[in-house]
Amino acid sequence: MLAFNNDYSHGAHPAVLQALVDTNMEPQPGYGTDAHTERAKQLIREACQAPDADVFLLVGGTQANATVIDMLLAPYEGVVAAETGHVACHEAGAIEFGGHKVLTIPGYEGKMHAEDLENYIHVFYENESYEHTVFPGAVYVSLSTEYGTLYSKAELAAIHAVCQKREIPLFVDGARLAYALAADECDITLPELAQLCDVFYIGGTKCGALCGEAVVFCGMHAPAHPIPRIKQHGALLAKGRLTGVQFEALFTDGLYFEIGRQAIQTAQALRRVLHERGYQFFLETPTNQQFVILPNEDMARIREHAAIEYWKKYDDTHTVVRFCTSWATTQEDIDALAAVL
C-alpha cells in the first residue's frame, strides 16, 4: 500500500534512527538536562542566528501548541487564529481544555490577513463591555498552513507589526517547517523567521524525527518557570535524551533542510502527475500537501492501492482529498501512484 495520506506514516530518517542507536547505552540525566539536548539547543540557536533564544524540546505538536499558548496567555485571554487554523479545527479542543478560547477570524486559503487581525483587535477594544469578554492575548499562525500554503515575508511581517503595535505575542506553528522553508515560493529563511515572531517551533514529528518539536522563544524570553509548565501539559519527557539526540542529528550537516528538499521535490513530481491526469485542484499549494477534487468513484479506486486523506465533501459526487509527501517519499512511490491514477 502506497502512503500519501500524511507526512508522519514512516518512522525516523535513517540518520536520526542511527543516532538513537549509537547513543542508546549512554547513561544520561533526565528531563532535558543531558548533553545531547544541550548540544541540540545550541545547534538550533546557531541555525536561527539567535544566540540568546530560549529553546525547549517537547514531545509533540499538540503538546507544543497547548503548552506555548497557555504560557503566553493570562487566564482571561484567548488566542487569535484563522478559522482554518490547526488549533481552531484539528486539536480536539486542546487549547480550550487548557482554559483558553480560540478566537477565530477569516482565513483565506489557510492564512489570516493582517488587516483582519487589526480590525478584530480594534473592534474588541471599541466595545465598552470588552472587560466582560475574552481578551485577544496572542496570535497563532502556522508555516506552512493547514492548507499547505505559505505566508510571504511581507505578510508575516505585517501580522508581526500588528502584534507589536498591540503588544501581544505572535506564535508560529512550525510542524511542517522543513517543508515550508524548502518550497520554491518561500521567501523566509529560518533566521528571518526568528526575527518575525516571538516564539515558534521547529517540527520534528512530521520532518524526520520519531517524535518531538523544538520550541524557540526568539522575540521574547520564555515565561517564568517553563519546565514545570511544560510538565503540567504532559510535554516533558523523563528520557529527554530521546528528543535531544534526534534534534542533534537533524541539525547536524544540514539534515533538516535536506529532508525538506526531498519532500518538496517529490511533491512537485506528484503535482505534475495529478495535473497530467486531469484532476482539478482544490487550491494550488507550493509545499508537501496537495489538495485535489476527486470523483467519489476515483477516490474509492485509488484507495485500493494508496492511502490518501479525506479532507472535506465538495459536492454529492466529489470529495476533496489530501495527498502528502514526506522525507520518506521516493520517485518510485510517485511512479507507482501514477500507474494507479
What is the meaning of each model-derived region?
Residues 74-76, 268-341:
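Conserved C-terminal alpha-helix-loop-beta "cap" of PLP-dependent enzymes
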Residues 71-89, 118:
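Conserved PLP-anchoring active-site segment centered on the Schiff-base-forming lysine
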Residues 135-136, 140-145, 150, 188-277, ...:
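Active-site C-terminal subdomain of aminotransferase-like
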Residues 13-61, 83-88, 94:
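Conserved N-terminal alpha-helix of the aminotransferase class I/II PLP-enzyme fold
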Residues 99-146, 151-158:
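PLP-dependent aminotransferase-class I/II
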Residues 102-103, 170-172, 281, 309-310:
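Hydrophobic beta-strand scaffold residues
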Residues 151-183:
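Catalytic PLP-binding core of fold-type I/II PLP enzymes
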